[in-house]
From Swiss-Prot:
Transmembrane segments: none annotated. SUPFAM superfamilies: LuxS/MPP-like metallohydrolase. Induction: Transcription is highly induced by oxygen limitation and is under dual and independent control of Spo0A-AbrB and ResDE. This is Putative zinc protease AlbF. The active site is at E69 (proton acceptor). It holds the Pfam family Peptidase_M16.
Length: 426
């Protein structure tokens, strides 16, 4: 099947409805899937540390969204995991920077029993002081364990060096002092503001059944109401700092972590476009098996044994975290930027590799309902279709790629050099 036709087919299999309470239903059919994936996404994540109301703003401790996620596993004195397991379903939950998710997989004939249980728990929570105290201990332990994960620690340390006041610099579970400061009043205010039907999307992925047959009958569905979505944009990067931020021994730089601030490009501030452009660029620049890396390694005899990159791009800014190992690890960004400027005639070929890599990944991921959910959630978050994604990917041109290279070379950077001894211990 032609790639464009595949993305069109994804859209044809997508059915978006709303309940009368405002709950959004995102149905994506996949005939080959044996199980059905259900995910309720709440528009409340680790970045949400302020509740705005007519009576005034309420500041929340970091980690509030994640703490609520833990609490909502307890309903009427019972643990939801056990209730779902009794129905042959495995319930999980996770909090990201932008939202909170409750996810489970199930046989199709069990959804009419499990979905009402989950929605009842999310909409009708009763706060219990004993459970709050219990979860404070659990989450404190979780934070302490996360600090032992050096790679995770470097991620947040780099973002903190670049933007110390950003919520993105704080682990989603918060800090120990935040957990100690949380009280039931904070949690109740956050719950009341966030866990509203109009702030939720229920994803149903897999199978070929009509949406109505999978949902409990009391949920009356309507088509999407007429409205104009607000385009999500990303701001420009802050001014470049005069001083480079660095930790560790620059003389022993075989293991290097680099953080970069990224933002809007000249003439382009659309959030989804910037996300996809950086995804393509990362596949070109930071994958050991990419033609670009093979060329640059042979040309300059670079000794780099490991190379990986992750991007975090949101409406309030973006970061790229690069991890490289090898004798020339700390020089890679500068060398790569220079090589692109010297070989501009090859940009089209590199771009085609990056575009093919991303579109193939989406097509491959679609065979797995968990991965397919992530792309569906991106469509929902940016209010776009799968075909819109495809067109953004294909329309990326050489000038955009060169703008990314310029941004990468000139952006604020934070660097952590890890000693060889410490890297081996990890």
């Amino acid at each position: 099947m032609e790639k464009k036709a595949f993305f069109q087919q994804l859209d044809e299999r997508t059915d978006i409805r709303y309940t009368d309470s405002g709950l959004k239903i995102f149905r994506l059919k996949f005939p080959r899937a044996h199980l059905r994936l259900c995910n309720v996404k709440i528009d409340f994540g680790s970045r949400d540390v302020c509740i705005r109301a007519e009576s005034g703003d309420t500041l929340l401790p970091y980690g509030t969204a994640h703490f609520l996620e833990h609490l909502l596993f307890w309903h009427n004195g019972r643990n939801l995991y056990s209730d779902f397991f009794a129905h042959g379903a495995l319930l999980n939950a996770f909090t990201t920077y932008t939202d909170t998710n409750f996810m489970f997989t199930s046989l199709p004939d069990r959804l009419r029993q499990t979905i009402p249980i989950l929605l009842d728990a999310l909409w009708n929570h009763s706060f219990d002081k004993k459970i709050v105290a219990q979860e404070k201990a659990v989450i404190t332990s979780e934070i302490q364990t996360a600090h032992l994960n050096h790679q995770l620690s470097y991620h947040y340390q780099l973002i903190s060096m670049l933007s110390p006041s950003s919520p993105a610099a704080v682990f989603p579970a918060g800090r120990i002092e935040d957990i100690e400061a949380l009280d039931i009043s904070d949690l109740q205010k956050a719950y009341k503001a966030a866990y509203q039907a109009h702030r939720m999307t229920l994803f149903l992925i897999g199978g070929s059944e009509n949406t109505e047959t999978l949902l409990p009958p009391h949920l009356q569905l309507e088509k999407r109401p007429d409205y104009h979505a607000e385009r999500k944009i990303i701001p420009a990067c802050p001014p470049v700092l005069s001083q480079k931020m660095m930790l560790g021994d620059e003389e022993r730089m075989e293991d290097t972590w680099t953080g970069l601030q990224i933002g809007a490009l000249p003439g382009q501030n659309d959030l989804l476009s910037i996300k996809l452009y950086w995804d393509i660029a990362a596949r070109i620049l930071f994958q050991l098996d990419s033609p670009f890396f093979q060329e640059i390694q042979q040309t300059y005899r670079l000794e780099i044994d490991r190379l990986s990159a992750e991007t975090y791009i949101y409406e309030d800014g973006g970061f790229l975290i690069l991890h490289s190992q090898g004798t020339h690890s700390s020089a890679y960004i500068d060398v790569a930027s220079y090589y692109v400027t010297q070989k501009k005639e090859q940009v089209a070929a590199w771009l085609q590799y990056g575009k093919d890599s991303l579109t193939d990944a989406i097509i491959y991921d679609s065979d797995y309902v968990r991965k397919c959910f992530e792309w569906a959630a991106e469509c929902d978050r940016c209010d776009c279709s799968f075909l819109d994604m495809y067109h953004i990917i294909q329309d990326m041109d050489a000038q955009v790629f060169l703008s990314l290279i310029d941004a990468m070379a000139s952006s604020n950077k934070a660097i952590i050099h890890v000693s060889q001894k410490e890297a081996i211990r990890q």
